[in-house]
C-alpha cells in the first residue's frame, strides 16, 4: 500500500513540494517536509535531509536523524557512536523504526552498553528488551554501578523485563545504595525474578525501623508476588504491616 501511495506522491510531483518545505527558512516548516519524506519512504530524499542531522536546532536535528534512520538501508550499528543526547521520545522512535522496518537487532548491540553517550546506553537496553536479547546479561548487571541514575534505573527495569535471574543477588546488594525511587524499581524486578533468597532479603528489610511507607508497601507487594503463602502467614502481629497487607489484598481499601 505504501508503495502505491508513494507512486501517486511522485506522479503528482508532491515530493518537490516537500523539498520546498525542507528548504524553507523556518525550522518547523523544514520538519514538515522531512516528515513527508519519511512518511512516503522517499529514499531519494536522504541527501536533502542529511545536512540537518548536525543542525544546532535540537528538534530539527532530531527529526532529520530519525528520518535518516527510517530511510537508510544501512544497519543501525553506527548509532553506537551517536554523540548527541536522545530524548525518551526519540528513543521510542528509534525502536519504532526497527519495528516498522522489521530489522534484526544491531550486531554490535552489546557495545551500546559501553557507549560514552548515556542515552545510547539506555536505548541499547530498551532495544535488548524489545528483542528479548539476554546475551549481554553480565554487562547489564555491571550497569547497576553506573554513575548516572537513569542508566541504573533502565538496567534495573531490564533485569526484570528480561528475567535475568542471575542478577538477583546484585539487586540485593544494590538496594541500600539507592534512593527511594530505585529501591522501589529494584523490588519490582525482584517480584519477577525473586527466589527464596529474595524472600529472606525482603523479610530482613521489613524488620528494619523507620522504613519509608512506599518502600515498605513495595516490599510487601514483592513478597506477595514471590511467595504468597509465606506473605499470608508472616508479620501478623505487626499492626502497620497488617494494614498494608489488607490494602494489598483488597484494591477497594
Which residue stretches match the model-derived regions?
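Structured extramembrane domains adjacent to transmembrane segments
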Residues: 20-48, 53, 57-62
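Short inter-helical turns and helix N-cap capping residues of alpha-solenoid HEAT/ARM repeat scaffolds
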Residues: 25-26, 56-60, 86-90, 116-118, ...
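Terminal, low-structured helical/coil segments at or just beyond the last alpha-helical repeat
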Residues: 232-253
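Amphipathic alpha-helical scaffolding segments comprising HEAT/armadillo-like alpha-solenoid repeats
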Residues: 2, 9-22, 42-53, 73-83, ...
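Structural detector for internal amphipathic alpha-helices that build alpha-solenoid repeat scaffolds
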Residues: 2-9, 31-41, 62-73, 81, ...
Amino acid at each position: 500500500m505504501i508503495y502505491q501511495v508513494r507512486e501517486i506522491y511522485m506522479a503528482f510531483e508532491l515530493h518537490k513540494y516537500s523539498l520546498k518545505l525542507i528548504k524553507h527558512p523556518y525550522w518547523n516548516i523544514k520538519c514538515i517536509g522531512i516528515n513527508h519524506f519519511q512518511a512516503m519512504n522517499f529514499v531519494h530524499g536522504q541527501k536533502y535531509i542529511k545536512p540537518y542531522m548536525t543542525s544546532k536546532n535540537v528538534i530539527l536535528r532530531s527529526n532529520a536523524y530519525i528520518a535518516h534512520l527510517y530511510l537508510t538501508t544501512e544497519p543501525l550499528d553506527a548509532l553506537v557512536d551517536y554523540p548527541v543526547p536522545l530524548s525518551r521520545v526519540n528513543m521510542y522512535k528509534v525502536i519504532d523504526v526497527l519495528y516498522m522496518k522489521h530489522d534484526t537487532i544491531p550486531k554490535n548491540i552489546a557495545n551500546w552498553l559501553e557507549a560514552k553517550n548515556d542515552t545510547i546506553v539506555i536505548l541499547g537496553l530498551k532495544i535488548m528488551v524489545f528483542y528479548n536479547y539476554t546475551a549481554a546479561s553480565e554487562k547489564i548487571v555491571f550497569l547497576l554501578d553506573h554513575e548516572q541514575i537513569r542508566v541504573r534505573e533502565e538496567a534495573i527495569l531490564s533485569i526484570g523485563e528480561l528475567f535475568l535471574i542471575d542478577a538477583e543477588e546484585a539487586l540485593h546488594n544494590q538496594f541500600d545504595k539507592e534512593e527511594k525511587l530505585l529501591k522501589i524499581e529494584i523490588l519490582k524486578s525482584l517480584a519477577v525474578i525473586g527466589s527464596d533468597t529474595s524472600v529472606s532479603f525482603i523479610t530482613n528489610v521489613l524488620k528494619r525501623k523507620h522504613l519509608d511507607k512506599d518502600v515498605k508497601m513495595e516490599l510487601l507487594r514483592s513478597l506477595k508476588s514471590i511467595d504468597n503463602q509465606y506473605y499470608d502467614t508472616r508479620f501478623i502481629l505487626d499492626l502497620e504491616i497488617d494494614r498494608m497487607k489488607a490494602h494489598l489484598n483488597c484494591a477497594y481499601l
